[in-house]
C-alpha cells in the first residue's frame, strides 16, 4: 500500500522538477504553443478587424473585389457551378479533415506516434481557434444583390481558407519525404494552388471578403508554425537533425521504424 501511495508522489515530483524526458516535453510544448497561438491570434484578429473597418483602402478593396467577382458570377452560371463543386466538395473543410484523419491513422500504423500527434493537434487547434475568433469578432458576411451562394455563421476569418492552410501544410510536411525530389516542387505548387483556390472560391461566391480569406490564411500559418516549432524541439531533444520545409517534418518516415518507442531515446 505504501508503494502505491508513493508512486503518484514520485510522478508529481518528476513533473514539477521538469525531469519528464523528451516525450513529455514534446506534449507540454504542443499545449503551450497552441495556447500561445490562441493568445496571440485573437488580439491580431481583433486588430485586423479594426483595420478593415476603419482603414478606407482595405474597405474599398473588400467591396470592389466582391462587387466585381459577384458581377462575373451572375454572368457565368456555369462557372458558379464549378466554384460550388470546388468549395462544397473537393475543397470542403470536411474533405480536408478526412484527409488529415486518414493521414493520422496511417502514421499511427507506421509507428510515427509524435508525427501523428502533431498532425492531429495542428488540425484540431486550427479548427477550434478559427471558431473562437469568428465568435469573438462576429463579423457579418457580405450582403450582395441576387446572391449566388449563402453560408452560415460569421465571416472573419474564413474557415475554409484556414482549414485549407492547416490541412495542406500538415499533408505536405508529413508526406513530403515520401515524394521523389524531382516531384516535390509540384507538391508545393499543388498545395499552394489549393490554398489560394479555396480563398478565391469563397470571395467569388460572395460569402467572404478578401480580408476574411487573408485572416484565415494568416491564422492557419500561425498554428502550423507554432506546432511545428514544438515538433522540431522534440527532434532536438532526442538528438535528431533539424529539418527544413523542403525536407518535410520527419524524413525518417521513409524507414521501417521512423520514431523510437515512447519513453525510449533515439539511437544515435
Predicted regions and their residues:
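N-terminal transmembrane-helix/juxtamembrane module of multi-pass inner/ER membrane proteins
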Residues: 1-95, 137, 141-148
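Actinobacteria-biased recognition of intrinsically disordered, low-complexity terminal regions
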Residues: 1-34, 230, 234-268
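Hydrophobic alpha-helical transmembrane segments
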Residues: 31-35, 97, 116-121, 185-192, ...
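Alpha-helical transmembrane spans of integral membrane proteins, capturing the lipid-embedded, hydrophobic core
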Residues: 37-42, 89, 119, 123-127, ...
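Alpha-helical membrane-inserting segments
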Residues: 43, 47, 129, 133, ...
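Transmembrane helix-loop junctions in multipass membrane proteins, especially transporters and channels
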Residues: 53-57, 111-112, 138-143, 207, ...
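Membrane-interface loops
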Residues: 66, 97-99, 104-186
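Membrane-embedded catalytic cores of phosphoryl/pyrophosphoryl-handling enzymes
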Residues: 146-257, 264-266
Amino acid at each position: 500500500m505504501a508503494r502505491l501511495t508513493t508512486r503518484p508522489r514520485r510522478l508529481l515530483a518528476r513533473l514539477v522538477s521538469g525531469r519528464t524526458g523528451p516525450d513529455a516535453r514534446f506534449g507540454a510544448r504542443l499545449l503551450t504553443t497552441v495556447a500561445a497561438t490562441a493568445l496571440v491570434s485573437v488580439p491580431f484578429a481583433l486588430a485586423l478587424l479594426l483595420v478593415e473597418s476603419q482603414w478606407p483602402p482595405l474597405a474599398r478593396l473588400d467591396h470592389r473585389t466582391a462587387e466585381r467577382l459577384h458581377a462575373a458570377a451572375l454572368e457565368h452560371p456555369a462557372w458558379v457551378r464549378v466554384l460550388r463543386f470546388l468549395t462544397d466538395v473537393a475543397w470542403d473543410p470536411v474533405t480536408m479533415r478526412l484527409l488529415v484523419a486518414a493521414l493520422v491513422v496511417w502514421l499511427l500504423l507506421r509507428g510515427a506516434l509524435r508525427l501523428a500527434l502533431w498532425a492531429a493537434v495542428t488540425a484540431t487547434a486550427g479548427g477550434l481557434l478559427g471558431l473562437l475568433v469568428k465568435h469573438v469578432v462576429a463579423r457579418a458576411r457580405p450582403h450582395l444583390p441576387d446572391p449566388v451562394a449563402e453560408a452560415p455563421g460569421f465571416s472573419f476569418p474564413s474557415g475554409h481558407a484556414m482549414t485549407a492552410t492547416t490541412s495542406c501544410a500538415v499533408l505536405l510536411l508529413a508526406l513530403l519525404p515520401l515524394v521523389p525530389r524531382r516531384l516535390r516542387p509540384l507538391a508545393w505548387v499543388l498545395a499552394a494552388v489549393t490554398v489560394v483556390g479555396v480563398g478565391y472560391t469563397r470571395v467569388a461566391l460572395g460569402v467572404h471578403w478578401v480580408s476574411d480569406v487573408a485572416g484565415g490564411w494568416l491564422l492557419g500559418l500561425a498554428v502550423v508554425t507554432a506546432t511545428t516549432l514544438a515538433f522540431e524541439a522534440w527532434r532536438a531533444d532526442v538528438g535528431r537533425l533539424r529539418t527544413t520545409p523542403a525536407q518535410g517534418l520527419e524524413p525518417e518516415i521513409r524507414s521501417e521504424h521512423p520514431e523510437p518507442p515512447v519513453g525510449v531515446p533515439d539511437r544515435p
